[in-house]
Structures are given as structure tokens and as C-alpha cells.
Amino acid sequence: MKITYDPRHNVAYLRLEEKSAEVETIRISEELNVDLTPDGKIYGIELLNATQQLHAVQDGKLVLENEATGKTVEVSLP
């Protein structure tokens, strides 16, 4: 899994698959797209207007939490 952010276009992308694949993009809303592989698996999730969506969550920080251990890691967003 990899999360990328493009500040030029204010887009964040959560890529769930490591290998490149042909995808079909499903528009969920004006600010959310989901990419599906031909076999129906979720390849990635694209957040448009990302800073607005992600800043509303945790004061401008991306928080990753391991629910099994309770450990968290915070990453400041640009």
C-alpha cells in the first residue's frame, strides 16, 4: 500500500495494489474516485481536493493506527 500526494493538483491517492494494472475509474462523488481492476478488486482510491478532506480529519495530520497494538504514527500533511 502506498499513499501519494500531488500538491500541484491537490490530489491524494491510496494505492492498494503494488503492480501496475489497467483500471476502470468509478466516480463516487465530486471529490472521490475509486479505481477497479478488471476482476473487480479495488486498485486505488483518489481524493480530489485532498487537503480539505484530510485536514478535516486530524488537524492536518494523517494518523495511521494499528488497531491490534494501539500504536499510532502521525504524518504532517503539506
Residue ranges and their predicted role:
Residues M1-P78:
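Small, basic N-terminal interaction modules of short regulatory proteins
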